[in-house]
From Swiss-Prot:
Listed name of the protein: Cytochrome c oxidase subunit 3
Domain of life: Eukaryota
Enzyme Commission identifier(s): 7.1.1.9
Stored Gene3D superfamilies: 1.10.287.70, Cytochrome c oxidase, subunit III, four-helix bundle (1.20.120.80)
Location(s) in or outside the cell: Mitochondrion inner membrane
Catalytic activity reported: 4 Fe(II)-[cytochrome c] + O2 + 8 H(+)(in) = 4 Fe(III)-[cytochrome c] + 2 H2O + 4 H(+)(out)
SUPFAM superfamilies, alphabetized: Cytochrome c oxidase subunit III-like
Class of enzymatic activity (EC top level): translocase
Keyword Metal-binding applies: no
Role of this protein: Component of the cytochrome c oxidase, the last enzyme in the mitochondrial electron transport chain which drives oxidative phosphorylation. The respiratory chain contains 3 multisubunit complexes succinate dehydrogenase (complex II, CII), ubiquinol-cytochrome c oxidoreductase (cytochrome b-c1 complex, complex III, CIII) and cytochrome c oxidase (complex IV, CIV), that cooperate to transfer electrons derived from NADH and succinate to molecular oxygen, creating an electrochemical gradient over the inner membrane that drives transmembrane transport and the ATP synthase.
Mitochondrial intermembrane side: 35-40, 106-128, 184-190, 257-261
Amino acid sequence: MTHQSHAYHMVKPSPWPLTGALSALLMTSGLAMWFHFYSTTLLTLGLLTNTLTMYQWWRDVMREGTYQGHHTPPVQKGLRYGMILFITSEVFFFAGFFWAFYHSSLAPTPQLGGHWPPTGITPLNPLEVPLLNTSVLLASGVSITWAHHSLMENNRNQMIQALLITILLGLYFTLLQASEYFESPFTISDGIYGSTFFVATGFHGLHVIIGSTFLTICLIRQLMFHFTSKHHFGFQAAAWYWHFVDVVWLFLYVSIYWWGS
């Protein structure tokens, strides 16, 4: 902030946007190689480059915000707007999956037997594992709110406990979802039902894994005394993201598991 007459963070030159773009090129090329030639070398290289880029870029962001004081109130306001826009883009991303599901289920074609679920498909019972998954995610929504309130009250120990509980519930949800996939009587290849089911719930599962990782980083940062009641946007963004994941699951449960079965 030296020799600066404004509160905005003037970011110094960084290699991470370039390495991030390179990793995106390697991953997309690697996916094509994997799909067509069954070679995972390029994809592995892309994933490794992407992981290293994310780690080092966010490490720099944490240093700038926590130790160098660059995340002033106007900068934090910009970060909040950025996170809100990101979550909005995710809402539209999932809207596409719901559109595909309702387009297929509200007016089933003769090829599907004229009804939904299509002929030959045995849907999962919504009152078994899906209902347990719903309970787990709702409980995690309560625990992340508990963590937030504990942070605002400067109760460090309760914040750590609540955050750890949230992460464990996220892990439990992921394991339940994986077991459900392995035991499912249909696959992603079973027509439009299998496609919409596995793509929608699979992308949600991916978001749960991302959110759990996000919260794990927040737990590590809390253990390192990075957060205060006045300065904790990293945790706030993770909590917003987790609540978004919760709400999307409720729509998935009601639409695909309950109504769709």
